[in-house]
A protein has these predicted regions:
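Short beta-strand segments enriched in small/hydrophobic residues
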Residues: 26-55, 65, 72, 136-137
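Short, surface-exposed alpha-helical segments at coil->helix boundaries
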Residues: 49-60, 81, 85, 144
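Periplasmic-binding protein-like
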Residues: 92-103, 122-126
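Residue-level recognition of beta-strand->loop/alpha-helix junctions
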Residues: 72-76, 102, 127
Length: 146
């Protein structure tokens, strides 16, 4: 049952990230012909954790399918909110078309994500979200139903 749920989550993530990439792609394509630039900031990159590995692979597959560039940056520890915020700041400086993020904190990243949005960067929440609704898209399971 758990494996089935992981595969289902993986499939849903791929589809939704692909939809986000496609939507941004077609919007930006009208402006000019170029590859989209995406930065995905998960809570952690851990090769022993199937969940995070699946999410990252799904995002990379969707980016490849839609001819987008994706970079994955993550803090060393899953609960390293400060490290994740530094990566958000770095991403804002890079000015990608979108930041895909699995926020480690419900409140601690709000101001930075608002700043990114004000800079014209699209925001997609993957697996978790923040108190402020700054996102263009949220991809998550209902943990109470699951």
């Amino acid at each position: 049952m758990k494996k089935h749920r992981k595969l289902l989550t993986f499939g849903v993530v791929i589809c939704l990230v692909a939809g986000l990439v496609a939507g941004i792609f077609y919007y930006k394509q009208a402006e000019e012909e170029r590859r989209l630039s995406l930065i995905y900031i998960p809570k952690v990159v851990d090769g022993t954790n199937d969940f995070w590995t699946s999410l990252i692979q799904g995002a990379e597959m969707a980016a490849k399918e839609y001819n987008a560039d994706i970079r994955v940056w993550a803090p060393e520890e899953e609960n390293d909110v400060e490290g994740q915020n530094k990566l958000i700041e770095r991403a804002i400086e890079e000015k990608p078309d979108a930041i895909l993020i699995s926020p480690s904190s419900f409140t601690e990243s709000d101001q930075l994500l608002k700043k990114a949005k004000e800079e014209g960067i699209h925001i997609a929440f993957i697996d978790s979200y923040t108190q402020e609704e700054v996102q263009d898209l949220t991809v998550a399971t209902d943990n109470l139903e699951a």
